[in-house]
Amino acid sequence: MTHFSHLAWREDLLQGKRCRWLRKSTDLDHDKRTTESGSRSRGKFNREPAMLGTSQAGHSPLSHRRTVLVRSQNRRTSWCNAMSPLDITDPSILSRPADLCAEPLSDKGLQRADGCGRLVLSCSEHGTRIEDIFERSPTRIMFPRPGSRPVEEAVIINTGGGVAGGDRLECSVTALPGASIAVTSLAAEKVYRALHDPARVSNRLKAHESSRLAWLPQETIIFNWARLHRTTEIELFSGSELLALEWLVLGRAAHGEIVVGGSISDSWHVKKDGRLIWADSFRIADETFAHLNRKALLSNCNAIATLIYFGPDLDKRLEFLREILLSLECNCAVTLVGGLIVARCAARLSSDLKLALRSILQQFGPEIGSGPFRVPKMWSC
């Protein structure tokens, strides 16, 4: 008779890692095993595995048939039917497989990213220069034109390749008086599926008087069951000029992915001279994704963008921007709130939204004096 010890070796990680059970036998004749029906088996594996811990009717609980997961020497996993003389009342044996099924998956306690990037720019006789810079992995800040040339564009890089649940990323950009800078990202940011904790992204922008700051990152792609909590805090001073953009893409269209669950929280807080002039919060919870096709919500639009502008001649530039939006094929609207131009754009595909945003920057940029307010170079890479 073949005797099976209880758990001989186990390696389990709660996120889909393997759980290996090794079989130990005290019987030298491994090829001949007696089943409870009295028939003989030649070590063949049963292709219809039974539940571990279930017993056949009419047999003693100490001699019922079990199915044991075996990791063989050739590293192939098979199901083996055999007699087990184990005491099924032993909690150390029966509780362990149940724990693996009953215990919910969690990403708590796993290693998470804690990135930070701070950039301060000032104005000199040769143009904008770097006053201070700080980086903490996985956040990097690069410049397309290094050396003694004036800084025109800064590129935020996430070397981790994406954002997972529990990650924290912070970015701070300060334009001192007279500085002019455009900040973008190297590629689209990806937010992966999260089990428990959301990914937290915090962006802080500060534009002092006579400075010009453009915040134009590429899209953020939300994977199915991703959890994102993002805040964008902007502090403006009289005489400054700012153009800021954030856009979200729900799912990967090339994969045919449809986001059916998750959590998204995207909020803006804009202050002028220390006073709050605009606050906005966009949230989608698990139960909301099933209703995004409604016209009152996203009306089947999987790509959405928010664009804000602060500067002089707001009324004139509002009308100019409205004419641009009317010529676009995606759904767009613009308004003036608290001394701030706010535009919304939505499209079914991210490619359509990107074309619309490029068109806005190409036409609206020269109207407000170009400089940093143009299509970033990284958008064409």
Question: Which residues fall in each region the model found?
Answer:
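Residue-identity detector for glycine
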Residues: 16, 38, 43, 53, ...
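N-terminal, charged/glycine-rich beta-strand/loop interface patches
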Residues: 79-219, 224, 231
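Intrinsic-disorder-associated, low-complexity terminal segments enriched in Asp/Asn/His/Tyr and depleted
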Residues: 3-6, 12, 27-31, 46, ...
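Acidic (Asp/Glu-rich), glycine- and aromatic
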Residues: 223-231, 236-263
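A structural signal for small-residue-enriched, beta-sheet-centric alpha/beta enzyme cores
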Residues: 248-381
